[in-house]
Swiss-Prot record:
Upper classification of the organism: Bacteria, Bacillati, Actinomycetota, Actinomycetes, Bifidobacteriales
Keyword Cell membrane listed: yes
Membrane topology, from the record: Peripheral membrane protein
Keyword Membrane attached: yes
SMART domains linked to this entry: Haemolytic
Official protein name in the record: Putative membrane protein insertion efficiency factor
Primary role: Could be involved in insertion of integral membrane proteins into the membrane.
Amino acid sequence: MTASFKAVMIGGVRWYQQHISANTPPCCKYYPTCSNYAIEALERYGAFKGGVLAVLRLLRCRPWSRGGIDDVPQRYSVFYRFSWSKAHEEPRLTPLATTQREAQR
């Protein structure tokens, strides 16, 4: 049941990307965009936990926010942005994929 609900939620985000977001100029301050963040969170953590992370991301995306790189956390935590132990997951200047490639060199 949760897998089908997750698929419906991802379908809703993809519909938004194709029909609404495609017709407006890009304006998201974060990388990845809020809709891509939502899809990744839903795929990684499922409908409930991924949905919570997606809503929290939308609440962070406001006109007075700094923006930046804000990846889905590696371990689920609603409070990961406020935890000193997870400071390595704060928004970075380079994407996670680039950082991993450089570490392998």
